[in-house]
Amino acid sequence: MAAKGWELKVTEFTDYVQPNEVVESGDMDANYFQHITYMESYNEEKGTHLVDAGDIHYEPLGVYPGKQTDLSAITDGAEIAVPNDTTNEARALLLLQEQGLITLNDGAGITATVNDIKENPHKIKFVELAAEQIPRSLPDFDFAVINGNYALEAGLNASTDALATETSDSDAVKKYVNVIAVKEGNENNEGIKALVEVLKSEEIKKFINDTYQGSVVPYEG
């Protein structure tokens, strides 16, 4: 940012409300912590006017091996652990559908639950657990779908350990990409455009890839 003539001041928050309040009030110019769906829901609930100034990264869910190691050879009746919260369960099911393991009802999309499974040829048993609990329970299941942040905390490498991960062009990623949020009308400010340009630069992409090893991925959409 300095090379572009801007001084960047960073303030850390420990909750998901204050960062939006200070941007809405104009006390701060932007925040970077939330995915676009959360921002839109926050606007709807709070009557705020936050907009997406730039799509920066996503944290892909991955399918990790437990008792079994080959998705293409999954046995009938296999148990797969999936997150039990609405958002991540839907993402998990969409990912498993992309791998050809199940078929969901038409239109299920990012609100899908296990009740939306239309075809389950391998008679997979889905066990719903709190997302943070799944990594330590991995040995108990044939496979598990794990969030990027919890995989990272558990020492799992999404690039080398996951059998499949969400990709940039998936519907789920488009809905859960982390963004630079600003107050409506400020998205074309020169400072904001400079910030987005820096965060989408090849240098920052390399930093993200080298640091997080696939658990956080630069968004290319």
Language model features: what each stretch is:
Residues 1-9:
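Short, polar/charged alpha-helical segment
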Residues 10-21, 109-136:
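Short helix-initiation/N-cap motifs at beta->coil->alpha
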Residues 16-47, 153-155:
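Pocket-flanking alpha-helical
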Residues 24-34, 78, 101, 122-125, ...:
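Alpha-to-beta junction loops
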Residues 41-53, 66-69, 140, 145, ...:
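Ligand-binding "clamshell"
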Residues 53-102, 205:
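A conserved helix-loop-strand patch within extracytoplasmic ligand-binding domains
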Residues 60-71, 176-189:
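A bilobed periplasmic-binding-protein/Venus flytrap-type ligand-binding module shared by bacterial periplasmic
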Residues 90-97, 199-219:
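Periplasmic-binding protein-like
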